[in-house]
Amino acid sequence: MAKGKDIRIRVILECTTCTRNSVNKKSTGISRYITQKNRHNTPSRLELRKFCRYCYKHTIHGEIKK
């Protein structure tokens, strides 16, 4: 059995370009992805390059609070 807090947690990644400038987009919305991270290996905020379907290009997606 697991003791204490879980090591792997679920995090939500949100497009940083969509949240900054919502004027230059072709369609409305904010791209979000759900993934997991290991709390011991990555204690800081997670940032990954993912495809944003609203900006139509690969952008940096950062971890947000739940």
Curated annotation (Swiss-Prot):
It is found in: Plastid, Chloroplast. The keyword Ribonucleoprotein applies. Gene3D superfamilies: Ribosomal protein L33. InterPro entries: Ribosomal_bL33, Ribosomal_bL33_CS, Ribosomal_bL33_sf, Ribosomal_zn-bd. Keywords: Chloroplast, Plastid, Ribonucleoprotein, Ribosomal protein. It comes from the Eukaryota. One of its GO terms (biological process) is translation. Its main location: plastid. GO terms for cellular component: chloroplast; ribonucleoprotein complex; ribosome. One of its GO terms (molecular function) is structural constituent of ribosome. Belongs to the bacterial ribosomal protein bL33 family. NCBIfam families: PRK00504.1, PRK00595.1, rpmG_bact. This is Large ribosomal subunit protein bL33c. It comes from Manihot esculenta (Cassava). The gene is rpl33.
